[in-house]
Amino acid sequence: MDQFECINVADAHQKLQEKEAVLVDIRDPQSFAMGHAVQTFHLTNDTLGAFMRDNDFDTPVMVMCYHGNSSKGAAQYLLQQGYDVVYSIDGGFEAWQRQFPAEVAYGA
């Protein structure tokens, strides 16, 4: 895959539930602590190395940000690092929280 794909929150939720992909959140630490999707890895410059070490490059990665814009750049970056399949989640955490309020965790 040379280009990431966009995915809606319903499809992302299904892939996460079926363990077909991993979910990363690239928002700032304060926003992440105020609420994030359950089963999310907080991907930052500081945690990127650990994420790449602990996740297979053939496991699809779904990238979440605030509204679905910043995630596109991060998704493209992960492809360039060697991940085979990467998705950018349309609507970001804002859409996730609206559609799946019970699937939101709080704290770091």
UniProtKB/Swiss-Prot annotation:
Key words, A-Z: Cytoplasm, Transferase
Catalytic activity: thiosulfate + hydrogen cyanide = thiocyanate + sulfite + 2 H(+); thiosulfate + [thioredoxin]-dithiol = [thioredoxin]-disulfide + hydrogen sulfide + sulfite + 2 H(+)
Domain Rhodanese as annotated: residue spans: 17-105
Alphabetized GO MF terms: thiosulfate-cyanide sulfurtransferase activity
Active site: 65 (cysteine persulfide intermediate)
GO cellular component: cytoplasm
Location in or out of the cell: Cytoplasm
Family matches, as SUPFAM superfamilies: Rhodanese/Cell cycle control phosphatase (SSF52821)
InterPro entries tied to this protein: GlpE_sulfurtransferase, Rhodanese-like_dom, Rhodanese-like_dom_sf, Thiosulf_sulfurTrfase
Enzyme Commission identifier(s): 2.8.1.1
GO biological process, one term: glycerol metabolic process
Broad class of where this protein is predominantly found: cytoplasm
Top class in the EC scheme: transferase
Primary role: Transferase that catalyzes the transfer of sulfur from thiosulfate to thiophilic acceptors such as cyanide or dithiols. May function in a CysM-independent thiosulfate assimilation pathway by catalyzing the conversion of thiosulfate to sulfite, which can then be used for L-cysteine biosynthesis.
HAMAP family from the UniProt entry: Thiosulf_sulfurtr
Xref: PANTHER family: FAD-DEPENDENT OXIDOREDUCTASE (PTHR43031), THIOSULFATE SULFURTRANSFERASE GLPE (PTHR43031:SF6)
Family label: Belongs to the GlpE family.
Protein name: Thiosulfate sulfurtransferase GlpE
Species whose genome carries this gene: Shigella dysenteriae serotype 1 (strain Sd197)
Gene field: glpE
